[in-house]
């Protein structure tokens, strides 16, 4: 088989890591597609996407259409390159059927769930939030639907009880190259398989979703916190202030019939709150406009004992 010509489309860190790994392979990366540069921070300094940084470091042409409708010339430029494959991971821009039809072997999407479970924008967070014990990487032949294409390859990954969205994201960034390379090696003979099972949807995360519902079980709250770490962050409301939570542990003791959301006790080692079944101890909290701190450090400058017995929500 001749050396494949590949165009890569992606934007954030996870895409950048896969691109780095792809450069180490025998394949020829003709061009890279990524979202337009953004002005960020107080100084509104223009920043390149992580994928663009990697592409420029490897002297690869970069295309950054606002959309393919607004920049149809990019489609023509891609057609002229005659790629064998286009690899897509977290690109963030809708691609038309005309784009999907360009490469000889089609467009391959790297999706970080075991499809058809968790189609959509936030598969990592939704898998943790739901308490799933496994997830994985799917190499999918893209079609016009939302993550509905046939499956070419999968890699299953366990979700540990300590995994957050960040740690699981990092695992995907490291491991996604393996099933991709396996797929590319067999691209001429691999047989696509239709997705099997009932689909579920990983809807986009909103900032407001971080609010903790203490009427749920301690395990459900653990899943909630880990799903929304680092963004948007899980929090509770105390004195009309949103208090973000950091490190925590579940205390395997009952709540002595105290109502869910009751602040049971405050120690130098933690801030104990009743859930529907157990006690959850927060070892770190972040008050508005402050850093995330250990409880012992917060107690050095703040009187929290007055909240013992207070019911949240």
UniProtKB/Swiss-Prot annotation:
UniProt xrefs under Gene3D superfamilies: 3.40.50.12230
Keyword Acetylation listed: no
Annotated binding of (6S)-5,6,7,8-tetrahydrofolate, by residue: 113-116
InterPro entries: Fmt, Formyl_trans_C, Formyl_transf_N, Formyl_transf_N_sf, Formyl_transferase-like_C_sf, GART_AS, Met-tRNA-FMT_C, Met-tRNA-FMT_N
Record CDD domains: FMT_core_Met-tRNA-FMT_N, Met_tRNA_FMT_C
Enzyme type, top EC level: transferase
GO CC term, one of those recorded: cytosol
Keywords assigned: Protein biosynthesis, Transferase
Gene Ontology MF terms: methionyl-tRNA formyltransferase activity
EC number per UniProt: 2.1.2.9
Annotated catalysed reactions: L-methionyl-tRNA(fMet) + (6R)-10-formyltetrahydrofolate = N-formyl-L-methionyl-tRNA(fMet) + (6S)-5,6,7,8-tetrahydrofolate + H(+)
Function field: Attaches a formyl group to the free amino group of methionyl-tRNA(fMet). The formyl group appears to play a dual role in the initiator identity of N-formylmethionyl-tRNA by promoting its recognition by IF2 and preventing the misappropriation of this tRNA by the elongation apparatus.
Record-stated family: Belongs to the Fmt family.
PANTHER family assigned: METHIONYL-TRNA FORMYLTRANSFERASE, METHIONYL-TRNA FORMYLTRANSFERASE, MITOCHONDRIAL
Protein's name in the database: Methionyl-tRNA formyltransferase
Source organism (scientific name): Francisella tularensis subsp. mediasiatica (strain FSC147)
